[in-house]
Amino acid sequence: MKNFMDENFLLQTETAQKLYHEHAAKMPIIDYHCHLIPQMVADDYQFKSLTEIWLGGDHYKWRAMRTNGVDERYCTGKDTTDWEKFEKWAETVPYTFRNPLYHWTHLELKTAFGINKVLNPKTAREIFDECNEKLAKPEYSARGMMRRYHVETVCTTDDPVDSLEYHIKTRESGFEIKMLPTWRPDKAMAVEVPADFRAYMEKLSAVSGVTISSFDDMVAALRKRHDFFAEQGCKLSDHGIEEFYAEDYTDAEINAIFNKVYGGTELTKEEILKFKSAMLIVFGEMDWEKGWTQQFHYGAIRNNNTKMFKLLGPDTGFDSIGEFTTAKAMAKFLDRLNTEGKLTKTILYNLNPCANEVIATMLGNFQDGTIPGKIQFGSGWWFLDQKDGMEKQMNALSLLGLLSRFVGMLTDSRSFLSYPRHEYFRRTLCNLLGNDVENGEIPACEIERVNQMVEDICYNNAKKFFQF
């Protein structure tokens, strides 16, 4: 029987162990998509308790606690103490066997705090106190956590109207780790509620200095902000979409649709789809002009629980995997940009694993030989960033594309304790490749190439691809 989470955790063969310990483990982290709060980095925030850094905003844990019968007040309530919340989480952990939360929890305790104990109700108080004692030390600040995990670059997720003041403050402080913004313009496409769209346009107008009264005005304002993001080091955009939008439209139609929604009138479903289609093209062209990488996270159905959405708002654990037929629209969107000669580097992330092979084959349609892996299949995302999900993504990419050109892992997380997800990914990658070598599916005489492949996927490919 193997020990739980020892140095060879998830590494089933001697080759896998060598690949990880001699190659993957030493590579710095490039976290090119995350949801860290930039102000915490700028201010070098000192966390008040393990509950704050671990449970605050973590909808993965909240979902598990609710499923385990824990009352909402211990997840998101304001009338419970940090210890009471943590105690309920500790009671839930033993019920998470085979859920990635169990592995993540113990990897984070081990790598951040040097704790090898299993978390359960018996050990909860001891672990809580020990972690809180360490969190009070300067080396456990927000920046300290990033240093601890050998992070080199992080890319946060930012709205076009954001001031980026904390990115600027962080850079000017001389902090050695790069924190770069990512352009996330979802609200500029959100025309379902006219009042919300109008309010956002007013914010965009104020921050850009462009008076907005037409579609062209809006695009001009967005371009000014796009330029500003570029000045602050931005190299990626990100789009959270249910599905791809590729409706046919005319400029006259889009102008009329803008005027209608800006004037406060609800749009038809057809008008909404046409507007979103136009905006994706506009954003794709902007990114191409600057040589950015565009990312698309698609396939989630969000805020499914109306009662809890009204109570807690978005991103609180009430989203799930959607089921959309989107291959034709995806191809049409990419083809339009490609035909115009304006298809920039692209990463496609699906939330439904049924689309793994769809994406893996879509990539090859638009690779043009200018950049290795120009169109990328993004790492397993959200519900899929666990061992099984990552293996399936890498297997599909291996079978239908080039795994060796993959830009690798990202946390997509709000937590400064999520960096062990890179280790989890690296161990999974090394186990896959190590098993293939041991099984004679990759020749042992090519082990140096395999070594290089591991280092490339863990770090080098992303470094070159994003030009950090």
From Swiss-Prot:
Enzyme Commission identifier(s): 5.3.1.12
Source organism, top-level taxon: Bacteria
Single GO MF descriptor: glucuronate isomerase activity
Keyword terms, alphabetized: Isomerase
Metabolic or biological pathway, per its Swiss-Prot or TrEMBL entry: Carbohydrate metabolism; pentose and glucuronate interconversion
Catalysed conversion reaction: D-glucuronate = D-fructuronate; aldehydo-D-galacturonate = keto-D-tagaturonate
GO biological process: D-galacturonate catabolic process; D-glucuronate catabolic process
Record-stated family: Belongs to the metallo-dependent hydrolases superfamily. Uronate isomerase family.
Protein name as catalogued: Uronate isomerase
Organism: Phocaeicola vulgatus (strain ATCC 8482 / DSM 1447 / JCM 5826 / CCUG 4940 / NBRC 14291 / NCTC 11154) (Bacteroides vulgatus)
